[in-house]
Amino acid sequence: DAENVNKTPMSISANLDTLTLRPGLDMRDAKLNAQTGISGLSLFTATGSADDGSPLSAAYDATQPGGATVNVESGNAGFITQALIGADFLEGGKLELTGKFTKDASPATFDIALTDVRMRNAPFLTQILSLASLRGLADTLGGEGVLFSRIDVPLKLANGRYVVTGAKAQGPALGLTTSGYMEGKSGAIEFNGVLVPSFGMNSALGGIPIIGDLVVGRDGEGVFSLTYAISGTLEKANVSVNPLSALAPGVIRRIFENPSDTRIPEAKLRAPDEPVPSELPPIPEESFE
């Protein structure tokens, strides 16, 4: 019967003109291999190209007992990030995403690496550069864009919260670190980190033993660097920069930072005898200057 057919293991291989990975993201000239088991899809690989002609591959593996892994590689990081999350401020570059989903209640974890990508008209970064009186960099960001040779983003996802801890962006003109979270439903955000202008030259002292550790502080930071914070929502956020932190060595600069809450919220379970509400409670309005 139909139920038994759905549980029958199958192997599929196909060459497809178009494979829709998700709405807005199609793979052209795709070579597809997939396997299903009694629990559903167990293995999936697809290689092809994106709409702009750049190479694109995706893989999913649920054959291991610990959970499932996912891998996405693209020859155009800007195109993929726009298709996946609607981010239109990245151009070009390469992207590699690896992730793991566990079978228990642990958060899903992802590591995202982008290389040789250009950032242009990023709203929050433009505000940070302006508040830091880095007008030249702000103008470049709004014009040809700022080049980052590498961006690394460690990401956790659970209960609707996207948590970033220790993300780094490095380029000849600018370096950044950031940690914080975004709530998927409400769009609430809270991030903070360090901004390093002239990153290549500014962080060179980090290679000096002992002295480098003292004045630079942490990996991804430089001698002259400013701390920043973003809080509010995606639509309306408060951006602040601490100019005094630019004068402090790396270790002392920790005093000026206000670490964001990067905890994963625990899911609240409903008691068995508690009735299911007919409607959600109103969300309190918050204002951010």
Name these PLM-found stretches.
Residues D1-V196, I230-L244, V251-E289:
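Solvent-exposed beta-strand/coil patches in large extracellular/periplasmic or lumenal scaffold regions
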Residues V196-V239:
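Surface-exposed, gly/pro-biased binding rims or lids
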